Amino acid sequence: GGIGSAYLGNLGGASIPLDAALRPDYRNFSFAQILDAYLVTPDRANFYNTKKPFTHLSYFFGGQKKRLEESLWATHAQQISPSTGMNIDYKSRGTRGTYTNQGARDKNLSLGFSHTGKKYSIHAGYIYNMASLKENGGILRDGDITDTVFDMPEVIDVYLTDAKNEYKNNVFYLTQSYGMPLRRLSDEDFSIAERSSVFIGHSFLYSRFWRKYTDTKSGMAKGEDVKPYYEHWYINPTASRDSTFESLLSNKVFVQLQPWDRNGVVGVINAGIGY
């Protein structure tokens, strides 16, 4: 949905939705906010219920080989029983970049397990997100773009030629609930989704984000008319390195009251406690 996004021009790079209402606002690990369009989260993870094993494989590419943009998507899902299934989803997207040191690669792996019984259900999984972004700091001289025509953008000078950002994210999650119908079920009731019920549930989430930025002084633009990218080098006179990580643990117990139909006007009433 929405009206598109503004991005740096390369697949896999930083982006932001043009619709302000759709822009993410990360309370945890804000460094990853620029990659929200590429991240898999528990809310975005897919679960499947298939009659037969299902496999899907797609590969897309475009552009010249030296500036290639490509995407690889792979999915496999199958049932252990009619109500229990497991699946794996993998995505790899990226580009070699139009300008010097502009390449990007984003990868996602999602493993899922689900069981939906008449009263008990569970959805659990593991997610791995990874991004490797080369950072060139931008075009050194705007005139190379506005006043001159270059047939080969890769010869245009940039501020940084060997800087890189790396991101990694590991997520373990689980949501389970047990439903207690407020009236006796019949053999014809496949589920209690349309019956007055009370659900007791538990959700767990552990997420760890890690980011590392590196560059070198030798990889920075030089010249009499070039202002130094950094004014000072404090710890290492030839290179810089910055790393950050954050871990998030969430453990909650909740109760849902379903007065009538789950999809009705009053679907569910929620209450819970957790940390």
Predicted regions and their residues:
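Surface-exposed extracellular loop regions of Gram-negative outer-membrane beta-barrel proteins
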Residues: 69-112, 263-275
